[in-house]
């Protein structure tokens, strides 16, 4: 997350090109954001020293502030990869997606979102989502059409699909954090470690506190026998590995080559 105190800077052609390209993507992993920044310097100011990414983004955010837009930093819930998304702060509703989707498509997203938030796992099956098609507002939608719309949500990085089930993409979590907290106050889950919104993660079987998988990994990094940070009972779940960009670079792994694994709350 960006801090509240920002250094007011002056937007150059480098910043403007970066912002324009980020807008076309909506959300990018940090490694891609750094590559994008270097590309923009190469195109517009190849002799300049590449500014520290945090300062570079703060300069852009200081200009975007009056437009109620912000480049926000978050992490993916499944493996803790840093991501950056261009977030619209002017509205806290699903209507911020309105320029890309029709009314009945937005309502389908709301239905999927509600199922995801209400679930214990952070996932909603395609079957359960499609069963709600008859309840959609606006133009009638067939199940085949709804399947296509769900794939559009995936392509636009609002949802992630794993083994026929859907969960929220990091972009959706960054964009809709406030909306989710206000709309589903009784169902919303918060990580015991970072206090951020939690969709998928692990939970203590004794006291019920929940933790993001990356937070689990970091908290228990040096523990041979992990115990709950709240009640001190034994933590029975498998502790995932912490995302390490250097290690990933060395092994030459890319996310596209990884077989997606199911991240479940327990």
From Swiss-Prot:
Entry comment on modification after translation: Ubiquitinated.
Biased composition (Basic and acidic residues): 243-252
Chief place where the protein resides: nucleus
Catalytic activity: S-ubiquitinyl-[E2 ubiquitin-conjugating enzyme]-L-cysteine + [acceptor protein]-L-lysine = [E2 ubiquitin-conjugating enzyme]-L-cysteine + N(6)-ubiquitinyl-[acceptor protein]-L-lysine
Listed EC numbers: 2.3.2.27
Keyword annotations: Chromosome, DNA damage, DNA recombination, DNA repair, Metal-binding, Nucleus, Telomere, Transferase, Ubl conjugation, Ubl conjugation pathway, Zinc, Zinc-finger
Subcellular location(s) per record: Nucleus; Chromosome, Telomere
Record's keyword annotation contains Nucleus: yes
Gene Ontology cellular-component terms listed: chromosome, telomeric region; nucleus; Smc5-Smc6 complex
Family: Belongs to the NSE1 family.
Protein name per the record: Non-structural maintenance of chromosomes element 1 homolog
Gene designation per UniProt: NSMCE1
